[in-house]
Amino acid sequence: MATIFITGSTDGLGRAAAQSLLDQGHRVVLHARSADRAAALGGLTSRAKGLVIGDLRSAGETRSIADQINAIGRMDAVIHNAGVYTRPSRGATPEGHAETLAINTLAPFMLTALIARPARLIYLSSGLHRGGEGSLDDLDWTKRAWNAATAYAESKLHVVALAYALARRWPNVLCNAVDPGWVRTKMGGAGAPVDIDTGQRTQTWLAVSEDPAALVSGRYWHHLEQQEPAREATDPRFQDRLIGKLSELTGVELPEV
């Protein structure tokens, strides 16, 4: 059985993925933003291998999450599930970053760099990533007028590009990105067409399955099928520039092979 860490596992797709993997007999490490949010996990906590607490909008707390995970031990897979949708304003984290960028892009990048390297990495993206401008000149929205939809789309483009970059740089790790679709969660709303079980299925399959179809790297998935992502995501030059920018913003270097 595998050990899997899932960010943002108190509700929505993260909780559904945790429930599914626990039901399959796997060991799951849960994550909550705060102790108050952890209380919402209820009985899942007693079934889990561990619980880490930290707010991904804070670089300091993100580092703490990585430390907590490394203290538990090496993970077999990490599902980077946590994220926010459209924010009404740029906001500012304790470090001064745009909140959408910090939670959706900087946090998974930092955790990837700081957590002992697992065998599999899965990043939750969105079909909306294709609406990102693909510009790396103002990642942190310090010059542009705030556009919530564009900021979200760009953040989801970033994690697809990160998955492809890691597949190229870390050949011994299976790195993939997933579009779960428009799912009926608190974020997606009651009118979303995709049920939560369907929404969580691809990422949990990629995390633990020995099916040869799941043992691939550098792919973009939607409902167990591979799709083509935005052109920028597969461009090594874009990937390398992005990683350089993220290292500058976080002060964290991505380890080499």
Q: How should these model regions be labeled?
A:
Residues 24-40:
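Conserved glycine-rich Rossmann-like NAD(P)H-binding loop of the short-chain dehydrogenase/reductase
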Residues 105-106:
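Ankyrin-repeat alpha-helix packing hotspot
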